[in-house]
Regions:
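Hydrophobic faces of well-ordered beta-strands that scaffold small-molecule active sites
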Residues: 3-7, 30-32, 62-67, 91-93, ...
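Active-site-proximal loop/turn and secondary-structure-junction residues that shape catalytic pockets
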Residues: 9-11, 34-36, 68-71, 95-99, ...
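Active-site acidic/histidine proton-transfer and metal-coordination neighborhood
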Residues: 16-20, 24, 57-61, 70-159, ...
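Acidic/histidine-rich catalytic cores of soluble enzymes
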Residues: 19, 120-216, 267-268
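Glycine-rich, proline-tolerant flexible connector loops at the mouths of alpha/beta enzymes
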Residues: 31-52, 99-102
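Charged helix-capping and loop-helix junction motifs
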Residues: 43-50, 76-78, 104-116, 142-146, ...
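A short, acidic, flexible beta-alpha connecting loop/helix-capping segment that sits on the rim
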Residues: 236-246
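C-terminal helical cap(s) of enzyme catalytic domains, especially alpha/beta-barrels
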Residues: 246-266
Length: 271
């Protein structure tokens, strides 16, 4: 089980310090987020290679770089080029949003064209793109992502049951089946969430929850299930909830994740 850690909670730590933190937490590598306020920003994408070197020095991999890129432009050219230079195999693209002011078909057509251009650019550099199943986008579920991909085989998918819980849920087996099997999966996002009463009477809100504290996503079923089907790709652990001590939070959730993995396989109740 290869577990990458999304570097978001560590902010703008220098590469060497980030590598130290991830190694101390017990991660296998980084899901390196390229965003303002992070170790690597869009304007300092040359630091992808520097960060990858720092991680390698600690025995860690840069298994995935996560970006906000949605179309092929000069910024995308730089970031993808630096991913290739650093030997990063996968790059997560940004989020294609639904605009209620436009009709769905128009949004989908524009997103398809933008993704196609980005995928072609990545292919020229030898980098594989992954599309996350993410709430608040045109691709919150396997079915919606499949419509966006429109048969493209060069873009993999990044299932994320925690994110999918924000808009309901989707049986993880159905997700894989709709996508076309494990061969279409580049990485699996790991986090959990809870639904709780909101401030307005009768309303409910979904908030991120420490993985170690449980939540609405049945990881004790999903993880053994993926293993049983032969999934050998990476997992990306996300700590999106407020954490005063990111290292302690990551270490705790990572320990819980590995503990689930080592438990006997649980089966879903008969239907």
């Amino acid at each position: 089980m290869r577990v990458l850690v999304l570097t978001k909670p560590f902010g703008d730590l220098p590469p060497e310090e980030l590598a130290d933190q991830l190694a101390e937490a017990g991660a296998d590598g980084a899901d390196l987020l390229v965003r303002d306020g992070q170790t690597v920003t869009p304007s300092t994408s040359w630091r992808i290679a520097e960060t990858a070197r720092a991680l390698r020095a600690k025995g860690l991999e840069t298994g995935l770089v996560s970006t906000d890129l949605t179309s092929a432009d000069s910024e995308a050219e730089r970031i993808i080029g630096h991913c290739a230079e650093a030997g990063v195999p996968l790059m997560r693209v940004g989020f294609y949003r639904y605009d209620a002011g436009l009709d769905y078909a128009t949004c989908l057509d524009r997103a398809r064209r933008d993704l196609a251009g980005l995928a072609d650019l990545a292919a020229r550099h030898g980098v594989r793109l992954v599309l996350a199943l993410h709430h608040g986008t045109l691709h919150p579920s396997a079915a919606h992502a499949s419509r966006l991909l429109d048969g493209r085989e060069d873009v993999l998918v990044h299932p994320d049951p925690g994110n999918q819980a924000k808009e309901g849920s989707e049986d993880w087996r159905l997700t894989l089946d709709v996508l076309g099997g494990l061969g279409r999966v580049g990485c699996v996002g790991v986090k959990n969430a809870v639904w709780e009463p909101g401030a307005v009477r009768g309303s409910w809100n979904c908030r991120w929850q420490p993985l170690a504290d449980g939540g609405v996503v049945p990881w004790a079923t999903i993880l053994p299930g993926l293993t049983g089907l032969g999934y050998t790709g990476p997992f990306s652990l996300h700590v999106h909830y407020p954490a005063d001590d990111p290292l302690a939070a990551v270490r705790r959730d990572l320990g819980h994740l590995r503990g689930i993995r080592s438990e006997p396989t649980t089966t879903s109740p008969a239907r």
